[in-house]
């Protein structure tokens, strides 16, 4: 993210430098394109040309928990800096003072949820926060990750039902308070669905946070051999007043909207909160079908039959199991249901 952001800003900066030189020389774009790279510009006194680069990798800060990824990020920024420097030299048509690896890179190794972000960069020098936090569901976290959630959301209602990515929204919101800093995060779309909306966004909105723009659900795609099978959203949020119009992106289209609520809809901020008691005289509901065993107790028809051949007494403990795919395709799987199996039977 830092590398792509740096490259985008430097490309914009190069375009600005090119336009300023054209304006000073009184030439059009077509005339500029006729100038060869080998021509030298004489009599240069414009500071824009003498010192054309204002965007530096030293203005970018990052926190990465993995040491190898941190090293890769540093190297990528150095390479990007060198590439963009060459492009700038072609524009100003003169060599620039540049020594590879001379610039220091502010990539710090550590747990971003336990590091004080102001120890990395004081918020008075910070303009934007962006990131692609880990995608880990509320029921799939490690003990360390669950401890991060409990620490950051101490005192929050239903914090145990929040996905891991919600920690970055909370951490960024705390840092942005009473500043002009703006944030944008890529997240699983769970942060804008179900009980996460009331659990996360209601307290944040009450604390003065608002959503500036959002990309509604899209499928995450990459060139990696093992692609992440997740659906994502991008949410830009801040606490400072924003004179710009709010924009909601969906399916390649952008829409100017009055408000963006926690469900990423152009509606008022309403919240559907969980209840443990029904509104009328109807039976209470339970959790229902919730397979979070890692698939260890789920069997296909063939797997179930092979298991029963080895353990015939297990036949009575197999129950048909239907999820959405099994129901639609009429291809049931089986669950080894040991809730009624006594310890003595298990020992046989």
Task: Outline where the language-model segments fall.
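Signature of N6-adenine DNA methyltransferases within the class I
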Residues: 3, 10, 70, 78, ...
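Flexible phosphate/Mg2+-sensing switch loops adjacent to catalytic phosphate-binding sites
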Residues: 9-58, 81-101
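C-terminal segments that line or cap access tunnels to active or ligand-binding sites in enzymes
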Residues: 330-338
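Conserved hydrophobic/aromatic beta-strand scaffold that supports enzyme active sites
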Residues: 232-236, 321, 335
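Conserved SAM/SAH-binding beta-strand->alpha-helix loop
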Residues: 66
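Conserved SAM-binding motif I beta-strand of class I
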Residues: 60-63
């Amino acid at each position: 993210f830092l590398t792509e952001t740096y490259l985008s800003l430097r490309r914009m900066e190069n375009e600005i430098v090119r336009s300023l030189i054209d304006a000073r020389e009184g030439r059009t774009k077509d005339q500029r394109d006729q100038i060869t790279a080998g021509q030298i510009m004489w009599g240069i006194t414009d500071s824009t040309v003498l010192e054309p680069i204002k965007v530096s990798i030293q203005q970018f800060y990052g926190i990465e928990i993995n040491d190898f990824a941190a090293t890769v990020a540093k190297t990528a920024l150095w390479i990007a800096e060198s590439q963009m420097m060459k492009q700038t030299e072609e524009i100003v048509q003169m060599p620039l003072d540049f020594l590879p690896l001379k610039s220091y890179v502010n990539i710090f190794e550590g747990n971003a949820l336990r590091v004080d972000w102001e120890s990395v960069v004081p918020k008075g020098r910070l303009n934007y926060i962006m990131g692609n936090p880990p995608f880990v569901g509320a029921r799939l976290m490690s003990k360390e990750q669950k401890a991060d959630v409990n620490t950051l959301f101490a005192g929050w209602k239903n914090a145990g039902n929040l996905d891991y990515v919600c920690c970055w929204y909370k951490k960024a919101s705390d840092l942005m308070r009473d500043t002009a800093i703006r944030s944008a995060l890529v997240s699983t779309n769970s942060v804008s669905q179900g009980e996460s909306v009331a659990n996360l966004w209601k307290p944040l909105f009450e604390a003065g946070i608002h959503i500036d723009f959002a990309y509604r659900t899209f499928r995450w795609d990459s060139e990696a051999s093992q692609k992440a099978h997740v659906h994502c959203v991008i949410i830009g949020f801040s606490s400072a007043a924003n004179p710009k119009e709010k924009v909601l992106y969906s399916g390649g289209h952008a829409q100017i909207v009055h408000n963006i609520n926690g469900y990423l809809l152009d509606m008022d901020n309403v919240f559907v909160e969980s209840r443990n008691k029904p509104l009328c005289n109807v039976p209470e509901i339970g959790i229902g079908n919730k397979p979070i065993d890692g698939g260890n107790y789920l069997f296909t028809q063939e797997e179930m039959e092979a298991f029963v051949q080895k353990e015939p007494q297990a036949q009575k403990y197999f129950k048909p199991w239907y999820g959405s795919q099994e129901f639609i395709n009429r291809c049931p799987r089986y669950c080894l249901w040991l809730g009624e199996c006594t310890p003595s039977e298990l020992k046989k």
